[in-house]
Swiss-Prot record:
Source lineage: Eukaryota, Metazoa, Chordata, Craniata, Vertebrata
Name recorded for this polypeptide: Exosome complex component RRP42
GO molecular function: 3'-5'-RNA exonuclease activity; mRNA 3'-UTR AU-rich region binding; RNA binding
Keyword Nucleotide-binding: no
Organism of this sequence: Homo sapiens (Human)
N6-acetyllysine sites (modified residues): 116
InterPro entries referenced in this protein's UniProt entry, alphabetically: ExoRNase_PH_dom1 (IPR001247), ExoRNase_PH_dom2 (IPR015847), ExoRNase_PH_dom2_sf (IPR036345), Exosome_comp_Rrp42_subfam (IPR050590), PNPase/RNase_PH_dom_sf (IPR027408), Ribosomal_Su5_D2-typ_SF (IPR020568)
Single GO biological process annotation from the record: nuclear polyadenylation-dependent rRNA catabolic process
Modification sites for N-acetylalanine: 2
Record CDD domains: RNase_PH_RRP42
Length: 291
């Protein structure tokens, strides 16, 4: 993961600021930086989104392809996650430097979506045991400026909201053989319900307090962080500790409560933005180099 080197004086300055609920950029401990969300940014995908969180820049594309259901879940489709850490994001990702981080992020996404409540995978089934939709979720890290997991989870949810899957009809002839017919109408499609798709809230322990949406400088002052996967209703679906340090049980409970509280606000803001952008349709102004 991208990192910065700080002097002891800089670390003391950051830690003391956090204790007083006044971070270097003027935010409080539970405040996010400005989040920019843009959907439908890649034309050759079923759905896409780009999220900028401070200096962190994430692009997510979703492609729907037909596949065969898994043996243990014959009536469901499934999601596959791929994470590419661009060398332009940080020099540390040159060569195979970003492979470990990409695998770590993909595994975290699998854990978050490995339950029946996040996405109704039965809507992706075309013909039980024979055909289903497979959603390939490609995550590209364009720039790393701290708080990667939160930005990625926001981008994934926005891209899934933007995803349109062609409606399919299964036709059976007199001999019992089946034919699959895809609708030619681009508006005749199915959409996933993302109401229960969680977002990650990362809480970094700095000194005796914890902060959300840490910058690279703040991450350098933290020995342990807690990733909390929260739904729009404030339900925690998954937790994971990262970092070399340890967390006492009381701190974990406090961080969970903060994650639930902040997560509900994050979901409400994201939902408002994507619905507003969709309502504008072609009239919306596209920004960024993909516009």
């Amino acid at each position: 993961m991208a990192s910065v080197t700080l002097s002891e004086a800089e670390k003391v300055y950051i830690v003391h600021g956090v204790q007083e609920d006044l971070r270097v950029d003027g935010r409080g401990c539970e405040d996010y930086r400005c989040v920019e969300v843009e959907t439908d940014v890649v034309s050759n995908t079923s759905g896409s989104a780009r999220v900028k969180l401070g200096h962190t820049d994430i692009l997510v594309g979703v492609k729907a392809e037909m596949g065969t259901p898994k043996l243990e879940k014959p009536n469901e489709g499934y999601l596959e996650f791929f994470v590419d850490c661009s060398a332009s994001a940080t020099p540390e990702f040159e060569g195979r430097g970003g492979d470990d981080l990409g695998t770590e992020i993909a595994n975290t996404l699998y854990r978050i979506f490995n339950n029946k409540s996040s996405v109704d995978l039965k809507t992706l089934c075309i013909s039980p045991r024979e055909h289903c939709w497979v959603l390939y979720v490609d995550v590209l890290l364009l720039e790393c400026g701290g708080n990667l997991f939160d930005a990625i989870s926001i981008a994934v949810k926005a891209a899934l909201f933007n995803t349109r899957i062609p409606r399919v009809r299964v036709l059976e002839d007199e001999e019992g053989s089946k034919d699959i017919e895809l609708s030619d109408d681009p508006y005749d499609c199915i959409r996933l319900s993302v109401e229960n798709v969680p977002c990650i809230v990362t809480l970094c322990k700095i000194g005796y307090r914890h902060v959300v949406d840490a910058t690279l400088q703040e991450e350098a002052c933290s020995l342990a962080s807690l990733l909390v996967s929260v739904t729009s209703k404030g339900v925690v679906t998954c937790m994971r500790k990262v970092g070399k340090g340890s967390l006492d049980p009381e701190s974990i409970f406090e961080m969970m409560e903060t994650g639930k509280r902040v997560g509900k606000v994050l979901h409400a803001s994201l939902q408002s933005v994507v619905h507003k952008e969709e309502s504008l349709g072609p009239k919306r102004q596209k920004v960024g180099f993909l516009g």
